[in-house]
């Protein structure tokens, strides 16, 4: 029997989710795996949070993705779990990492074959929920003593579902002033072609020179059907309207990386360098038509049709250098420098074609340019003693921002410098007992889409927009940990200022110069004054017997938000319990199985309160073809209960929503491995573009 790593491991500074050995993860996407990872939650807008705190940096092999929002969600949905080795969850990173990420870092580590000779894998899978999903891919690796050439190609096709029910209620001075009931059914066929090609060259035993080229090409169609019933102040239905929207989106993302590593001597003194250049292009064609009806089904007013043509380009250039210098008696210091340049160009043209003749909609047409330069330097010092270890670090980051809104000639410039100290202390009480303490200061800059002032039409009563003046949020985080044998306990506290949140405002209040109907809303990012977070956690692996292993993770936390919006003061929080268990079973003749379960008692995010959610996933695996192949079958959320539901409350507005998604999916996956089994020492690359790739678009 070959031992394998558990699905979830709790290390001293991070949680590791070993995806490649997970049965229930087979055939799923990276997004699906994240949703089942300890402390990770994903809301109805695809915003990823960690232990109830938003502001997570998603990294791919140490490189933060420049994508955010819908684009990041689409990328993760198109990334098959078969290409992922593990996911590392780091809640309190050191000064060596970019200071971005209010709640920490989630680093998705891709598979990279380390065997000598020609090696590879082939994977094919099919999934069925309400709609089909399929993926196939191959990886190859050719390694000698002088070179290592590697690459992969993956194709994914998925049809997503989001059936959203909304009950919106408006108030004036505490008196009900009407509202509407919405039934929004959205399907989203999505296809992705992802490629990766790289080479490492070993001119001598001390030097490695490498490059990696990544390409991701997506096609995403959103078909949205919305039926709305309009309610008057007397709580009577007075009319209806139906909206149909189709978005035809394309995304072409290319990223190149050059890297260098030189080890000076056997003590571990080394110099590494990375240079990245990436271009992300996107285009979207939109058709949004609305018909208005009286209650008897006759026409109420002329139809409204809006066509949109949006193009975007994001380019980023980053470079970084890191130096590690071990000293005598367990001491070490590290230093590094990084610079990055990001440019975003978004051009949106909208036309009212209700009359049959296209007319430019000047309130929605826009052209927005964004330029950002970040310069950072850090210094870390650490020392190992007999019973304890200490690490202190300081990182400085300067940010220069320039925006240009060409229509309306509105410009915004900003420059700021911030220091980000960090400290880590570990004390070995006994051989099987360890005490740890960490503190760090971090920043969460707005995503590029949050800064874009475009006015996006969701339906005729719902819009979304961004704010160029949105401030970054700053967080002080503290964590105390205690490890006893296999048990790990944590207690954490954080204080955040300028807390970023999505608010819902009346359109007339946000855009008084643009004519609108009475009960029209706009989703807009805001800065709350602050938030405070306190939590405790436990990780408890249990070996029931030689064929049954259990890993239990629990987090209990409370987050309080402070701020105000439009006369609504927010001084609220609520306790939340997030509990997850993973059970793995190993049987004879190559059979194994998994059972996972999760429970979240419901959290508060600013003005929104979520209901409890829970789910169970099961899977079974059989080793075949002389252990070179595996066949896996799993079903996620078998009772279809892991569905978000929430209430959003302001003084003049209350919204209740319930989202039905395709969380229950049955997957069948086949994987075959070929080639040599001789494995040399592995090399893992991290590169320069650490924050930029997270915030794109």
Residue ranges of each PLM-predicted region?
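Outer membrane beta-barrel strand-and-loop segments of large Gram-negative receptors
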Residues: 307, 316-320, 361-366, 471, ...
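Extracytoplasmic beta-strand/coil segments of soluble accessory domains associated
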Residues: 31-68
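N-terminal periplasmic accessory domains that precede
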Residues: 30-33, 72-74, 89, 101-123, ...
């Amino acid at each position: 029997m070959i031992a394998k790593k558990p699905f979830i491991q709790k290390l001293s500074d991070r949680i590791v989710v070993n995806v490649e050995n997970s049965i229930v993860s087979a055939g799923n996407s990276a997004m699906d795996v994240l949703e089942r990872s300890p402390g990770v939650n994903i809301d109805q807008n695809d915003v990823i949070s960690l232990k109830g705190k938003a502001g997570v940096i998603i990294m791919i092999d140490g490189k933060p993705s420049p994508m955010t929002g819908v684009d990041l969600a689409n990328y993760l949905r198109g990334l098959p779990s078969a290409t992922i080795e593990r996911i590392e969850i780091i809640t309190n990173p050191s000064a060596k990492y970019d200071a971005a990420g209010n709640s920490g870092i989630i680093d998705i580590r891709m598979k990279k074959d380390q065997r000598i000779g020609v090696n590879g894998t082939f994977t094919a899978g099919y999934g069925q929920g309400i709609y089909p999903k399929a993926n196939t891919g191959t990886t190859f690796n050719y390694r000698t003593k002088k070179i290592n050439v590697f690459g992969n190609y993956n194709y994914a096709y998925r049809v997503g579902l989001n059936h959203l029910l909304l009950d919106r209620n408006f108030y004036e001075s505490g008196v009900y002033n009407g509202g509407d009931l919405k039934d929004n059914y959205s399907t989203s066929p999505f296809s992705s072609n992802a490629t990766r090609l790289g080479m490492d060259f070993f001119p001598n035993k001390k030097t490695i020179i490498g490059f990696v080229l990544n390409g991701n090409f997506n096609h995403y169609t959103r078909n949205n059907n919305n039926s709305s019933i309009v309610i008057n102040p007397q709580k009577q239905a007075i009319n209806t309207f139906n909206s149909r929207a189709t978005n035809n989106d394309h995304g072409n993302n290319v990223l190149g990386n050059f890297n260098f590593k030189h080890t000076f001597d056997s003590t571990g003194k080394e110099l590494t360098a990375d240079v990245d250049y990436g271009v992300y292009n996107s285009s979207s064609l939109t058709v949004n038509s609305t018909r208005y009806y009286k209650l008897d089904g006759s026409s109420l007013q002329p139809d409204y049709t809006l066509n949109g043509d949006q193009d975007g380009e994001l380019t980023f250039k980053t470079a970084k250098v890191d130096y590690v210098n071990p000293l005598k008696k367990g001491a070490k210091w590290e230093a590094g420098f990084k610079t990055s340049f990001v440019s975003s160009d978004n051009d949106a043209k909208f036309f009212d074609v209700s009359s049959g003749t296209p007319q430019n909609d000047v309130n929605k047409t826009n052209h927005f340019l964004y330029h950002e330069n970040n310069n950072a330097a850090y210094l870390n010092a650490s020392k190992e003693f007999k019973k304890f270890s200490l690490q202190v670090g300081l990182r400085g980051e300067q940010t220069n921002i320039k925006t240009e809104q060409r229509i309306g000639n509105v410009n915004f410039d900003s420059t700021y410098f911030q220091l980000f100290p960090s400290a880590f202390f570990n004390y070995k009480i006994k051989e099987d007992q360890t005490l740890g303490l960490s503190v760090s200061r971090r920043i969460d800059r707005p995503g590029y889409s949050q800064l874009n002032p475009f006015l996006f039409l969701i339906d005729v009563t719902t819009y979304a927009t961004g704010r160029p003046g949105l401030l970054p949020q700053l967080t002080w985080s503290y964590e105390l940990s205690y490890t006893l044998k296999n048990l790990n306990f944590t207690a954490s506290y954080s204080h955040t200022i300028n807390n970023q949140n999505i608010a819902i405002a009346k359109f007339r209040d946000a855009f008084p110069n643009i004519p609108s109907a009475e009960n029209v809303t706009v989703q807009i990012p805001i800065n709350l004054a602050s938030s405070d977070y306190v939590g405790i956690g436990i990780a408890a692996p249990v070996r029931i017997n030689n064929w049954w292993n259990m890993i239990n993770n629990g987090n209990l936390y409370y987050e309080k938000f402070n701020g105000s919006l439009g006369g609504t003061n927010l001084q609220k929080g609520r306790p939340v319990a997030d509990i997850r268990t993973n059970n793995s079973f190993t049987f004879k003749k190559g059979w194994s199985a998994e059972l996972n379960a999760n429970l979240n008692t419901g959290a508060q995010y600013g003005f929104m309160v979520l209901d409890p959610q829970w789910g169970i996933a099961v899977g079974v695996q059989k080793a075949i073809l002389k252990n070179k192949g595996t066949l896996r079958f799993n079903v996620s959320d078998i009772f279809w209960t892991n569905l978000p539901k929430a209430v959003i409350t302001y003084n003049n507005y209350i919204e209740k929503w319930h989202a039905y998604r395709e969380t229950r999916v049955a997957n069948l996956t086949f994987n075959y491995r070929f080639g040599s089994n001789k494995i040399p020492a592995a090399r893992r690359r991290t590169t320069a573009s650490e924050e930029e790739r997270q915030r794109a678009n």
